[in-house]
Amino acid sequence: VISITDGQIFLESDLFFSGMRPAVNVGLSVSRVGGAAQTKAMKKASGSVRIDLAQYREMEVFTQFSSDLDDATKAQLAYGGCLMELLKQPLCHPLTLHQQVITLWTATHKKMVHVDKKNVKKYQMDMLEYFENAYPEIGREIEETKQLSDELGEKILQVADEFKDRAAAM
């Protein structure tokens, strides 16, 4: 536990040893400033991530004792596993604001749950490269305005579907 003036951050060794860095337990950690420090685009893109990850971690622990999972539980575990993988970031390789927004927006709209967990990072990087090459104006708009309009959000989801179709054809 690390106490800070605007809340508390709970670190977990299990997360650390599984490759999550920083190993923050989002279900227990609390911050009063967190949202105020984010751009509007990031706030909109990451809307449900904290809750989704907390639910995933809870469900992951619960399902360790169960061998028979229904389809909804399997889908939620796949989604949570995808989010966990996407939040892992190599040392000294930060993503730009627009790359983070595109990643979170597509992930929270379940555009990557079809990808096997071990291939999620490659899929993410390939998708971001596709955005950069085919639709650079999307990244430019996010960087310039720091906003994620409904129209831009829809465009991102359309491009993500387009990339998925192209990736499946390869």
Where are these regions (language model features)?
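Conserved catalytic/coupling modules of large nucleotide/cofactor-utilizing molecular machines
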Residues: 1-170
